Amino acid sequence: MRIRRLLSFAAAALLALPVGAQVLTYGTDDGGLETGARLSGGVDWTAIPKKLHLKWDEEVRFDSDFGRLHKLYSSVGATYRLTPWLRAGVYGSLINTNSTDNGWRNRVRAGFDLQGSMEADRWKFSLRERLQATTKLYDVNTYQENATAWALKSRIKASYDIPHSRFEPYAAVELRNTLNAVNPAYFKYNKSLGRWDCTDTRYDDIYINRLRFQAGTGWKLARKQLLDIFVVVDSNWNLDIDTSSNGYSRASGAPLLTLKKGVFAGLGLSFTFKL
């Protein structure tokens, strides 16, 4: 009897909807597989006290099947060992991105993280939680995206110290959550204009937009020189909101919401010199 009542209520609710009511639908854009490379070099300085580490790093990234210089990173950071098993860190980056449509554009990023670790024989396990904010240094349509995007990254990593070897293989999995994306749940359909009204913009949409898998090995070239050789695979999901500059869906009939999917697979080399 209870199931019948629920079904009757659902049917009545559906019949109560106005005929021709507009429903916000999502299109899909599957970008397929893209390949590229990541190359970086940096300096890691153990300060006084020895619990403090300072780091400077430069990185270049290639995409479009190794055919385009996509991003340039300049980063500085610091980590402090709070306990034998817990570290806290801060960092900042200047990011220059090569966009197909708009050329080179700059962003700045700042973040804070906590990393806990434990060891079992020659195995080492760590969990890192990183909160970051990325601000675009160019004009954006705020009905489509937030000028400053907040994200939370959660990473689990395992590594193994091979006896009498210069190599230390590892594997890591990371989830990235967007924390303040434009929420389309507040969009309303304007019957007189025949368009969606997106002017009630609220930045409170939270969803996972990237899953990253990385595996590789650290190679101790010398006492103070380390080379990281790795492969990285990113599965990306991003909600693209296409509105005009006045906050309404476009008259051309282009889809307002598109879920853009894609997979990136890349090779990486990262060199660190320790002072």
Model segments located where?
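Outer-membrane beta-barrel transmembrane domain signature
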Residues: E129-R250, F273-L275
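Outer-membrane beta-barrel "beta-signal"
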Residues: L114, L259-L275
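Residues that define the transmembrane beta-barrel architecture of outer-membrane proteins
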Residues: L33-L39, H70-L72, W104-A110, N146-L152, ...
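Repeated loop/turn-to-beta-strand initiation elements of outer-membrane beta-barrel proteins
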Residues: A47-W56, W85-V90, D121-F125, H164-E168, ...
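Outer-membrane beta-barrel domain signature
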Residues: Y26-G32, D63-G67, S99-R105, N141-A147, ...
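Transmembrane beta-strand segments that form the barrel wall of outer-membrane beta-barrel proteins
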Residues: Q22-G31, K50-F66, R87-T100, R128-T135, ...
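Hydrophobic/aromatic-rich structural module bridging two neighboring secondary-structure elements via a short loop
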Residues: R68-W123
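Residue-level signature of outer-membrane beta-barrel architecture
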Residues: W45-A47, Y80, G92, G116-M118, ...
